[in-house]
Amino acid sequence: MSFFEAETVGYVLRIKLAPGASFNGFRGVFCDEKGVEFLKGCVTAVPEKGKANKALIELLSKTLKISGSQISLVSGETDHYKKIYINTVASGEFSAKLSGLIKE
């Protein structure tokens, strides 16, 4: 299982976010007790009034080189565990970009 899944149009990512971190970036993959994988994300923004969620969307936009309007929070608005939807054409090239986030 991977931290992302291709949909008919786009991708759903599972991210475990650490707000208030010392840097913005990704730190590999976290596997929960059920074996579900989450990309570990870190943002310097604090978890107040959606600031950390906004910072995560900006980080994904910058790293994946896509518009922030293509990225939306599906669930986890007030939780460390997030589901993110990316509205883009599912392709091998974009899947490789997502896999590359682990190496960030």
Segments from the language model and where they lie:
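Generic structural marker for isolated residues within well-ordered, non-membrane alpha-helices
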Residues: 57
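Contiguous, often N-terminal, cationic amphipathic patches that form binding interfaces
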Residues: 1-49, 54, 72-78, 83-104
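Short acidic capping loops at alpha-helix termini that bridge into adjacent secondary structure
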Residues: 68-70
